[in-house]
């Protein structure tokens, strides 16, 4: 079973997406939280054996440096640390401006194209708008946080034997069966019962497939918050 998630245009695009969730000025966002979100996303891609481009890894190393310096006891002011943060935020702000201009030009192009050709009919699951204006990528970012927490828990369990034969179809059937009884379930509650990371990943992919097929409905009421599955649409 192949699962394709909408990719970002680059590390700055991912950072801009994370920063925009706070709905405050770029220079007022909690930078350590943003860095942790970014690193969780990259780590989850690696665990799921999805390809991670080199520029994402380069940015990850820079962010880890900023985070480590942020968390160190401050005996003296670190001018270099402030410069790194300032430089990062300026890059995100500059990228935001360029992206806004690019989107405006693309919109004008699409409007002109309507006069000359019939627009292609295409359904892109990755871009589907979910309840509360959330996208599948928002769910994946939330899943990245859950995955990071679950990995920390499983590290303390040395008796677990990993399996790689979890079937997505079986997980889909299990979720549907559970929804028949409970009507509403949270993915975090399901993940708590999982014994391996492979099981967690399989359940998440099964959930995405059920959402794609409109068998279950999903909502996420807060940024990076829990993922709620419903039997019926609200």
Curated annotation (Swiss-Prot):
Please give the Gene3D superfamilies that the UniProt record associates with this protein: 6.10.250.2410
Bilayer-crossing regions: none
This protein's UniProt keywords: Cell cycle, Cell division, Chromosome partition, Cytoplasm
Q: What is the annotated signal peptide range for this record?
A: none
Q: Tell me, what does this protein do in biology?
A: Participates in chromosomal partition during cell division. May act via the formation of a condensin-like complex containing Smc and ScpB that pull DNA away from mid-cell into both cell halves.
Q: How does it assemble?
A: Component of a cohesin-like complex composed of ScpA, ScpB and the Smc homodimer, in which ScpA and ScpB bind to the head domain of Smc. The presence of the three proteins is required for the association of the complex with DNA.
Kindly provide the name given to this protein in its UniProt entry.
Answer: Segregation and condensation protein A
């Amino acid at each position: 079973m192949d699962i394709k998630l909408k990719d970002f245009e680059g590390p700055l695009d991912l950072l801009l997406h994370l920063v925009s969730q706070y709905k405050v000025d770029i220079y007022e966002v909690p930078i350590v939280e943003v860095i942790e979100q970014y690193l969780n996303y990259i780590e989850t891609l690696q665990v799921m054996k999805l390809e991670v481009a080199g520029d994402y890894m380069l940015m990850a190393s820079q962010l880890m440096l900023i985070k480590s310096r942020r968390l160190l006891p401050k005996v003296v002011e670190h001018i270099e640390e402030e410069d790194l943060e300032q430089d990062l935020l300026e890059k995100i702000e500059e990228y935001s401006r360029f992206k806004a201009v690019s989107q405006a030009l693309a919109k004008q192009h699409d409007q002109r194209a309507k006069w000359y050709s019939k627009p292609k009919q295409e359904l892109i699951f990755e871009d589907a708008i979910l309840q509360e204006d959330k996208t599948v990528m928002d769910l994946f970012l939330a899943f990245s946080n859950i995955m990071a927490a679950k990995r920390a828990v499983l590290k303390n369990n040395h008796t677990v034997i990993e399996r790689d034969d979890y079937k997505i179809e079986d997980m889909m059937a299990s979720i549907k069966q559970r929804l028949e009884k409970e009507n509403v379930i949270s993915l975090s509650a399901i993940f708590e019962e999982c014994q391996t990371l492979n099981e967690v990943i399989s359940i998440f992919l099964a959930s995405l497939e059920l959402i794609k097929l409109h068998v279950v409905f999903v909502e996420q009421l807060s940024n990076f918050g829990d993922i709620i599955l419903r039997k019926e649409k609200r």
